[in-house]
């Protein structure tokens, strides 16, 4: 299906007179799809921005402030959490790595000198909190020592060489993957962790304000293109799985199949059409694709610009449902993210 009036649509760039000649309404905005003869619009989804470090005050828990970030690489997001517990140590959590001292992770990434770490956290002054953390782990002076310490903490039990190699792999793949997943990207990750520490410290000392999750600077909107790329990515994985299954089945029977026999050509198209027709999307979300309401022209425009919040109706979060000053001029004034 092609979005009406998009680059590949034959109505793209036509003047009002040409549209009338083709039997089209010249005031029609486009931006929707026609699926099995029904006009369907893909509703924009509001989400927290990825790769952005936000510090907030949690309503409960052991630490006064918590820094959070979703590092996005390709199709997956990895949540990272930075917190300072009562012992004064900064702890970092991501995937399997739970509450590991942040200074150790920085050392494991190759930034070893205490002087350099303090300089990267803050050039023009010293934070006492950082010095406490550095003194705590002053005995660890080599990258391998730091890697081995972290590996033991998270329960990797093989020999020392294997432990260190496994730990390097985890740091490359799962720690801030948006900065890169190669060996040479490790030092950038260390610098970034220092910057995250600096922001965390400044917020905890009340030099900076706590980040507002509902500010539109900290949000991103998933438009039709993002939603369709998610759908395509998932269905290509299904297609590859189907292709492998067919290949193995035919080889077991002693046949050597051609590519044409292996690929079910309708599979990808049918799955994408089905999602767009029913509105059921990746990860089981419903109501993404909706039939356009054409009660009047304004309602149709409003429906095309509607934004849906990711919160379910049962979640109580009053701030997220209120109008924020940053919505002005960005969201349709008739439609708030709640759809009222």
Predicted regions and their residues:
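Conserved helicase core region in the C-terminal RecA-like lobe
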Residues: 331-338
């Amino acid at each position: 299906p092609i979005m009406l009036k998009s680059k590949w649509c034959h109505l793209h760039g036509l003047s009002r007179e040409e549209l009338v000649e083709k039997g089209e309404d010249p005031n029609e905005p486009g931006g929707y799809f026609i699926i099995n003869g029904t006009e369907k619009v893909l509703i924009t989804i509001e989400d927290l921005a990825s790769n952005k470090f936000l510090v907030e005050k949690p309503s409960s828990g052991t630490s006064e402030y918590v820094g959070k970030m979703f590092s996005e690489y390709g199709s997956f997001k990895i949540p990272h959490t930075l917190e300072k517990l009562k012992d004064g140590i900064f702890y970092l959590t991501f995937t399997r790595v739970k509450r590991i001292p942040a200074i150790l992770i920085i050392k494991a990434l190759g930034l070893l000198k205490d002087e350099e770490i303090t300089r990267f956290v803050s050039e023009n002054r010293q934070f006492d909190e950082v010095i406490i953390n550095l003194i705590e782990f002053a005995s660890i002076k080599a990258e391998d020592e730091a890697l081995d310490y972290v590996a033991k903490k998270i329960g990797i039990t093989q020999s020392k060489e294997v432990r260190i190699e496994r730990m390097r792999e985890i740091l490359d793949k799962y720690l801030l993957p948006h900065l890169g997943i190669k060996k040479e990207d490790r030092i950038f990750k260390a610098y970034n962790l220092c910057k995250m520490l600096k922001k965390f410290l400044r917020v905890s000392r009340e030099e900076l304000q706590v980040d507002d999750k509902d500010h539109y600077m900290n949000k991103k909107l998933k438009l039709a293109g993002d939603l369709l790329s998610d759908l395509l990515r998932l269905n290509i994985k299904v297609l590859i799985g189907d292709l492998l299954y067919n290949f193995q089945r035919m080889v077991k029977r002693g046949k050597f199949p051609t590519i044409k026999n292996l690929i079910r050509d309708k599979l990808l198209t049918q799955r994408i059409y089905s999602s767009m027709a029913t509105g059921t999307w990746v990860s089981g979300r419903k109501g993404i694709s909706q039939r356009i309401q054409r009660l009047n022209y304004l309602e149709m425009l409003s429906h095309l610009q509607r934004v849906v919040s990711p919160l379910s109706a049962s979640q109580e979060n009053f701030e997220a449902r209120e109008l924020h000053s940053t919505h002005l001029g960005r969201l349709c004034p008739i439609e708030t993210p709640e759809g009222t």
